[in-house]
A protein has these predicted regions:
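Peripheral interaction segments used for macromolecular assembly
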Residues: 1-143
């Protein structure tokens, strides 16, 4: 694999592309969609691993990319939105790739106002690897 740059992906105007909504102030959650901020985040074992604190958006392709969590113990980590199931009516976010206790070990960022290309790889790899290795029974063959 190739190591990606320790710099953020940029928009055509030279701004960091993926940022929290506290930076991209013109983004908002539409009224008909649940706002995940404040919702507890549950792992595949249904144990709470943290609370959603912020939404990270893509300025170039307007969509949510990550949820910023305060993991158990206070560490701030990102969760790819593609691996999160926001259950608005239940008021929880469910994640099948890792256990509740594993959120606190997710990679951190140098700055919580942007994410570098290398940091994106680390964050996505952490949760993606959990699909195969988060629990002992996932690490063994099915046969």
């Amino acid at each position: 694999y190739a190591l990606r740059a320790e710099e953020p992906d940029l928009t055509d105007t030279g701004e960091p592309r993926i940022v929290p909504m506290r930076v991209a102030k013109h983004f908002s959650v539409v009224d008909r969609d649940p706002d995940p901020r404040g919702m507890p985040v549950l792992g595949c074992d249904r144990q709470q691993g943290g609370v959603c604190k912020e939404i990270w958006v893509d300025r170039a392709e307007p969509q949510i990319r990550y949820l910023e969590l305060e993991a158990t113990g206070g560490k701030r980590v990102l969760l790819p939105i593609t691996l999160a199931n926001v259950r608005g009516k239940k008021g929880v976010i469910e994640v099948e790739s890792i256990t509740g206790a594993q959120f606190k070990n997710a990679p951190t960022l140098k700055s919580y106002d942007q994410i570098t290309l290398a940091e994106e790889d680390k964050v996505v790899a952490y949760y993606g690897a959990g699909k195969l290795y988060a629990t002992p029974d996932r690490a063994e063959p099915f046969l």
